[in-house]
Amino acid sequence: MAQIGVSAMKRIEDLLDIGSFVEIGSYISSRNTDFNLSDKDTPKDGVWTGYGTINDSLVYVYSQDSSVLGGSIGEMHAKKIVALYDMAMKMGAPVIGLIDCAGLRLEESFDALDAFGKIYLAQTKASGVIPQIQAVFGLSGGGMAISNGLSDFVFMEQDKAKVFVNSPNAIAGNSQDKNDFSSAKFQSESTALVDFIGTETEIISGIRELISVLPANNEDDMSYIECSDDLNRTTPELIDRISDPALAMNTISDSGYVLEVKKNYAREMFTGFIRLNGNTVGVVANRRVLYDEKGEIAQEFENVLSHQGSDKAAGFVDFCDAFNIPMLTLVDVKGYRATKCSEKRMPKSGAGLTFAYANATVPKVSLIVGDAYGSAALSMNSKSIGADIVFAWESAKMGMMNASEAVKIIYSKEIDSSDDIKSTLDEKTKEYENLQNSVVYAARRGYVDDIITVADTRKRLIAAFEMLFTKKEDRPYKKHGTI
């Protein structure tokens, strides 16, 4: 058996600033049950709880100890976590959970079940008030996986961590060897749960970085650091990097800082954080190309909205709005993904994305860098659904649909009766593009605020967000939306 508490405590020590951890509830152990848990050594009831600092910022942390009853959730275990949440809510500071949990403690039956519910309630109350981060280092099974889903960001150790509601071996016709859907790879690529995977060291470093870009709570000023980059720096190289927003953001952001979120899931949609003039800004962007670390093309995408990408973006917009983080949207979309699976999910997912943007009251700036066609473009933070500022590059194309497709419908009879179909099609396409798909036309109608050059992108975005810094927007009273 592993030495009690060593891994759980070491993770806390590695995570927090040196010497800053103060433990709370160190004398608590499990309560006696019909199964005589009093005969077992259950120090801290399997979870360390306390507070400390990350880069001098207050955080609350709990770390489950798998050497004590498998780190399972029991009455007193949960009581410690809920008490930690209560304190974090009073102080307006993030809660970080270091997860290594076998799930529900069977020996405690209803008391353990009630304990899980109280953790869920504490997380629900904290949602949108303080950031909630969990990192899974071992098991996170059954009800603990639901707790993962109630968090804002989830990290997962790449080799040993397992997240599941039902074990892969419990699914009819499946086994862990056949399809291990509890693995970090599956959870990060096929679900919308996991934001980051890596080694223990990478996860600890990643949490510290994430804390540095997030506000402490929903009333905190935007996370700010001193900007040493040139606010008027030109960005002509953006034109060659825009197909992969990760590279584009590296060009636009202060000193090239980019933190991509959920980067393994729905890769056709980029979500992440950058800094502009020292302030944290959330970014959503359509992606056409994914480059690997060597700068070679790893994957290409059609510039369409998928239901996975829409859900990913909507969740990110909701988080940024809850914590007053300004939003930048880079638009390059020509429509919706045309598959049977997409048709099953796209109406609801598209509505979710549209609602998230329309409902958000933080500063919202859009930049049209490629295509912006139809209702798919409307959903990507268009002027029509509440964008504060919409910029477009001179090369961008906007409209109801692609010009070549539009003229086939509008001028179908004229094209079919033409002696030279190709010439007629080309002529009508050019005419339609100049009249209806021009960013100049869109700007004249007020759907675009300004047409900017690629080189001026960074400084124009910074100026727009600076102007919007004190934005306040009143909405009709309602308890909450229903989308």
Model-flagged regions — what are they?
Residues M1-I483:
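Ligand-binding clefts of soluble mixed alpha/beta catalytic domains
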